[in-house]
Amino acid sequence: MTSIPIFESVSRFLPPANEDVQFWWKVTGRHMACMMHEAGYPEYRQVECLLFHRFKVIPCLGPRPHSDTPWYKSRVGGGAADGCPINYSWRFGTIERKPHIRNFIEPLGALTKTPADPLNEVATKALLQDYSMTLPNVDLEAFWTFAPHYRPRIIEKEDMEKLAGASLLVGAEMSPDSRTIDIKAYMYPRVPSQTSQLLTTILPQAMRDTYGEDVCLDSLNFVHDFMTNDPQGSQLALTGTTGIDCCKLQETRVKIYVITRNTSFDHIAAIMTLGGRRSISGELLGQLKALWYELKGAPAELPSSEQLPVQTKPDGSRNPIVVPFYFDIQPRLALPDVKAYIDVSTSPVSDLAAAKAVVRHLEQHGSGQNPKAYLNVLKDITPVEELETQKGALAFYSVAVKKNELDITSYFNPQVYKRYFAHEVQLNGQRRSVFE
């Protein structure tokens, strides 16, 4: 592991803590320090963000692992994750912008996984309220207005037990040249009927309650029409997941997440361009196609109208491929922005090969500042041999079009549970974790 002087200096002067906090600091605190160091954050910003992580994130991560099985399986990180309540993202920089670091957590508290909090929302709401009192840029007006619309109206005990699970996540973005921490909240409807009503009932009413009865719903209505009437858009399905910025109301964005099972690149391009309504140059679509094929392990000669080859699991069963997107809704804009997610956790391409493909793309097209710093981060968090032979470190790459270039973000996992025994050493006849 690379020595990170700022992490070591901050650690030296932290107050005593219990074993849970010590564990999460040693693991995730060091991960955050490594990311900011490699991304070239100013030293004052590294210290500021590390202190935020130690005192405002780590206390919400719950008990330290005591085996390779999580006591509560968080949905952070999606299908690639191992149940750990935190993961990270690295938004690659541009020529003019350094990389941006984020983490995503599902706060865990005393009531998590108990009948008192079946949706695990108590700790999250308490954390958001704390952020609103300590971070001057955080405004929860939109979140508090949206949240009741997403809460299930469940009366029957059997239904509540069946639908229990995560309903809220929190994201924290730590930009290198800012003095603030930007907070996002993610809501998950637990009842299937809520998801089907999202575009027609829940979101329109939530937006009117938030922004006022005269709010412009053109962007939201476009998404509904696109998913209803467009030949390509009608193949999309709502997941129910909705993200919202916790900032001043006039700056708040609402993100609606969808998936498709059509893996042809022509379909991907049609969604990114909203059926031709958003202009994306042929050059950028060509870059996206090349990246899509490489990350998915598809042959370069595969026609863009064809589906990706079927993938199989080790047991011989099919590994279904879904492609997530989100629509970025802003009342002041007539059309939403679109972002695609490329799931590499189910790809035949190794995590290391996928990471190198993205870095190679950035270098070839003159994007990003020192993109190989990202490889240094991955190799510091996960040994190279595991990146070459195992899956799970990488979850997704997201791709949007910003200022006539591809804006790429990597989402990856600390694998705290999966790797619990990976680096054990034999000591006095006892198996001990490297984290102990």
Swiss-Prot record:
Signal peptide: none annotated. One of its GO terms (biological process) is alkaloid metabolic process. Its EC number is 2.5.1.-. Keywords: Transferase. Pathway: Secondary metabolite biosynthesis. It is an enzyme of class 2 (transferase). GO terms for molecular function: prenyltransferase activity. Disulfide bonds: none annotated. Prenyltransferase; part of the gene cluster that mediates the biosynthesis of neosartoricin B, a prenylated anthracenone that probably exhibits T-cell antiproliferative activity, suggestive of a physiological role as an immunosuppressive agent. The non-reducing polyketide synthase nscA probably synthesizes and cyclizes the decaketide backbone. The hydrolase nscB then mediates the product release through hydrolysis followed by spontaneous decarboxylation. The prenyltransferase nscD catalyzes the addition of the dimethylallyl group to the aromatic C5. PANTHER family: INDOLE PRENYLTRANSFERASE TDIB-RELATED, PRENYLTRANSFERASE ASQH1-RELATED. Belongs to the tryptophan dimethylallyltransferase family. This is Prenyltransferase nscD. The gene is nscD.
